[in-house]
């Protein structure tokens, strides 16, 4: 039996691809998480039925949201990543020796776990000594945080705050 993944882009356009393998399909407190494999894109992550990234193209997004701000900021030492469960932005940031601390604030612990299991080439950035991963709501984290950030990167895949934050 063939399995297909389809993502609606507009009312007139739908992207569909044949799935070779379903590696993971779980429901977290925040969203449905699927890791699938296709011939065209390799492994890819879908959240609530929408593709977040694939092995073939993740570098485009991660490099753009990381290296452009780093190129124009004169002195980055402390960075906040809002979201960042897949670790791709952290992986790019750890290449900068000037950075002393990277705080990743992600509300979905299960998403971090799924990414660690299925995308270790991305999440390796989360294991650097300068990286701290906080599993909590970003707004709540910021309200209770002392200190400043030189750079904040929004890599959120879902709402930045919950109704009780």
Which residue stretches match the model-derived regions?
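N-terminal auxiliary segments of SAM/dcSAM-dependent transferases
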Residues: 1-39
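The AdoMet/dcAdoMet-binding core of the Class I SAM-like
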Residues: 2-4, 28, 53-163
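A general beta-strand register signal
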Residues: 46-47
């Amino acid at each position: 039996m063939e399995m297909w993944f389809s993502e609606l882009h507009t009312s007139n356009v739908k992207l569909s691809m044949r799935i070779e393998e379903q590696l993971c399909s779980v429901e977290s407190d925040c969203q449905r998480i699927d890791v699938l494999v296709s011939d065209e894109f390799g492994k890819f992550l879908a959240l609530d039925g929408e593709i977040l990234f694939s092995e073939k193209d993740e570098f485009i997004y991660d490099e753009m949201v990381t290296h452009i701000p780093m190129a124009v900021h004169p002195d980055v030492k402390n960075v906040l990543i809002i979201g960042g469960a897949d670790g791709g932005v952290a992986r790019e940031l750890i290449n900068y020796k000037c950075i002393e601390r990277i705080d990743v604030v992600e509300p979905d612990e299960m998403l971090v776990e799924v990414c660690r299991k299925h995308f270790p080439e991305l999440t390796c950035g989360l294991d650097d000594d300068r990286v701290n991963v906080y599993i909590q709501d970003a707004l709540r984290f910021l309200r209770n945080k002392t200190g400043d950030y030189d750079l904040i990167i929004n890599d959120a895949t879902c709402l930045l705050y919950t109704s009780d934050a």
